[in-house]
């Protein structure tokens, strides 16, 4: 359960400085897209042989479609991933020349954009009793508020299922 993201990488070389501003011009030679955030954790668990059921939210946007496709390529069950028109999929785009990170562009949902959670709790209530463990991967993007976290902890306790946390935010 967690914040699904897309990590995009553009690799290339810098041969000149832009005439519009004193910034390097990256001549892109290769692009790559990978699962980020909770998706990366899910992919790693799947690679270790775990049966992974993904639970999270993406937007109905290009990045969201790519995240779903990458999860499915890893044979990760995506029935717990909901897509919403009003939500923006988190995207981290890194631009790299040689071994130097030139820039990272972040596309995050606006702060006032509430993360749709209605299907999340419903999916967890029917799924938690059937799993061996729940891994919560919180990158602070709004999906896992206190109410959701309390619900997950209570479900784990009720069904004697371990709940493991991978927080990227202050958990006080």
Please place each PLM-identified region on the residue numbering.
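Ribokinase/PfkB-type carbohydrate-kinase core domain
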Residues: 1-15, 30-172
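Flexible glycine/proline-rich, aromatic-decorated loop/lid segments
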Residues: 16-20
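Divalent-cation-assisted or electrostatically stabilized phosphate/pyrophosphate-binding catalytic cores
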Residues: 22-29
């Amino acid at each position: 359960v967690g914040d699904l993201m897309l990590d995009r990488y553009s690799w290339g070389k810098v041969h000149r400085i832009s005439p519009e501003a004193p910034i390097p011009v990256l001549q892109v030679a290769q692009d790559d897209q990978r699962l980020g955030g909770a998706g990366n954790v899910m992919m790693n668990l799947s690679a270790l042989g775990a049966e992974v059921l993904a639970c999270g939210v993406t937007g109905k946007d290009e990045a969201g479609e790519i995240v779903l496709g990458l999860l499915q390529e890893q044979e990760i069950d995506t029935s717990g991933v909901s897509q919403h028109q009003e939500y923006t999929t988190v995207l981290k785009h890194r631009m790299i020349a040689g071994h130097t990170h030139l820039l990272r562009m972040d596309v995050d949902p606006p702060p006032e954009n509430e993360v749709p959670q209605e299907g999340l709790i419903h999916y967890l209530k029917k799924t938690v009793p059937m799993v061996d463990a729940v891994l919560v991967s919180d990158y602070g993007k709004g999906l896992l508020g206190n109410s959701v976290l309390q619900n997950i902890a209570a479900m784990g306790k009720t069904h004697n299922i371990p709940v493991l946390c991978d927080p990227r935010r202050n958990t006080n």
